[in-house]
A protein has these predicted regions:
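Conserved G1/Walker A P-loop phosphate-binding module
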Residues: 1-68
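Extended hydrophobic secondary-structure segments that form protein cores and membrane-embedded regions
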Residues: 11-12, 60-62, 95-101, 129, ...
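Conserved protein kinase catalytic core
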Residues: 31, 67-68, 105-108, 137-138, ...
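Short glycine-rich substrate-engagement loop in P-loop NTPases that contacts/grips substrate
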Residues: 38-41, 72-78
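Flexible beta-alpha connector loops of hexameric P-loop NTPases
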Residues: 64-73, 140-145
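Conserved C-terminal guanine-recognition region of P-loop GTPase G domains, centered on the G4
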Residues: 77-164
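Canonical P-loop GTPase G-domain recognition
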Residues: 134-203
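Extended helical scaffolds that flank P-loop GTPase cores
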Residues: 188-190, 194-409
Length: 409
């Protein structure tokens, strides 16, 4: 059975009229074809495939342009689309998001800055393209003014979003003849293709560790909330020993589920990323990806913390046994004096009061153990991150680009 082609995913976004269609035609030309018989993959988004070489495909998702008065709706569409891809397998993630602005309008609006910042916060690789940059050889006042506008746009984008200047690409998508008779050739295509390839590899080094941390934190807060809810909603007024025992077991089960869930999903993502990038490195470097990345695994650590919970629960139960025995001994006294009755009532009141103490103690026990498991997870993920960051991805994508050099882009 023939193995499917390696794919990188690109999302192209921008307001209506910025020249996205011209940009797509310029970069990908006749090799660009709509997938799915031209049907959109989701409302407002169409996808196309570009055959980079015999085994590598660039899949482009093209959003509809922003229409006036629909900024929030458009922003939601974009962020939801990226999020939905992040929840799929790594091969479906967007490795590059191209945000288009037009030099003709010269506008970089605040809501667009905010979209880019939100995308960057999730460790997406964002490349900014400024279209209609056809003034390189234009010595007229209009040409000089446009160059000034483009510089101001680049400065605003880099300052407000933190994007590196190297990730902002001025592009001229169509050939143009200036009034002075000089010809402006299309430019920027090779730079964009280069960034798409680089971003494919940078996703591994930057986004995968981020997603691992993000997933662990979500699981931690989710399980901590569930444990706290169980303890809070349990009444320890009657049948204290049985309830403490039952809650202790539930806490132990939650801790084990939390540890196993994180461990299994982290290992799965590590394995998935290793296999995906192994295919790339095998093709473009003719070596195993494991040469660069020895994928680690999360250790199983929940058992020792479950034992600690059980020991702490046993201590609570032992204290309850002593309290119950004290009350029982007062009950069976033959000489029921006022002092005995007083002591009995006091012991019963103390037993009732202890219900709140039990809840507080159990909450402290559970919180201490889940925090320790969380810390151990984070330490393990830190080692994974260090291992990933140590990989020589620059050599990987440089080699991939070198193999393509000389071919027609």
């Amino acid at each position: 059975m023939q193995q499917s082609k390696i794919k990188t995913n690109v999302l192209i976004i921008g307001k209506s009229g910025v020249g996205k269609s011209s940009l797509l035609n310029y970069i990908f030309g006749k090799e660009l074809e709509k997938t799915g018989a031209g049907k959109p993959i989701s409302e407002g988004i169409n996808t196309h495939d570009y055959e980079y070489d015999d085994e590598f495909v660039i899949s482009i998702s093209d959003t509809e342009g922003l229409e006036p008065g629909k900024a929030e709706q458009w922003k939601k569409l974009i962020l939801n689309e990226v999020k939905s891809h992040d929840e799929k397998e790594i091969c479906e993630w967007f490795n590059t998001i191209i945000y288009c602005f037009s030099a003709n309008s010269g506008k970089v609006e605040d809501f667009e800055i905010n979209i880019i910042k939100e995308l960057l916060q999730e460790k997406n690789q964002v490349t900014v393209v400024i279209t209609n940059c056809d003034n390189e050889n234009d010595s007229s006042d209009a040409g000089k003014s446009k160059r000034k506008t483009i510089k101001a746009m680049i400065d605003r984008i880099t300052e407000k979003t933190g994007i590196a200047a190297a990730d902002v690409v001025p592009v001229c998508s169509v050939k143009k003849i200036l009034l002075n008779g000089k010809e402006v050739a299309p430019t920027g295509k090779e730079k964009i293709i280069t960034l798409i390839i680089e971003n494919l590899w940078k996703t591994f080094r930057e986004k995968i560790p981020f997603k691992l941390y993000q997933y662990e934190n979500n699981e931690y807060y989710g399980y901590a909330t569930r444990i706290s809810k169980v303890i809070k909603e349990t009444s320890f007024l009657f049948h204290k020993i049985k309830k403490v025992f039952d809650v202790g077991n539930r806490v132990s089960n939650f801790l084990q589920d939390y540890d196993e869930s994180v461990r299994n999903d982290v290992d799965s993502l590590i394995q998935e990323s290793s296999e995906y990038y192994h295919r790339l490195s095998k093709k473009y470097l003719n070596i195993s990806w494991k040469y660069y990345y020895d994928d680690p695994h999360m250790p199983q650590i929940s058992l020792e913390y479950i034992n600690k919970v059980n020991a702490d629960v046993d201590n609570i139960i032992e204290a309850l046994h002593k309290s119950n025995k004290k009350i029982y001994n007062l009950f069976i006294k033959e000489d029921v004096s006022k002092e005995v009755i007083k002591n009995l009532l006091f012991a019963i009141m103390e037993n009732v009061k202890r219900s709140k103490e039990i809840r507080k103690t159990l909450d402290g026990i559970a919180n201490k153990q889940i925090v320790e498991i969380h810390d151990r997870h984070i330490n393990a993920l830190r080692k994974v991150k260090e291992n990933i960051e140590a990989t020589n991805i620059e050599k990987c994508y440089t080699k991939q680009l070198e193999l393509k050099k000389g071919d027609s882009l």
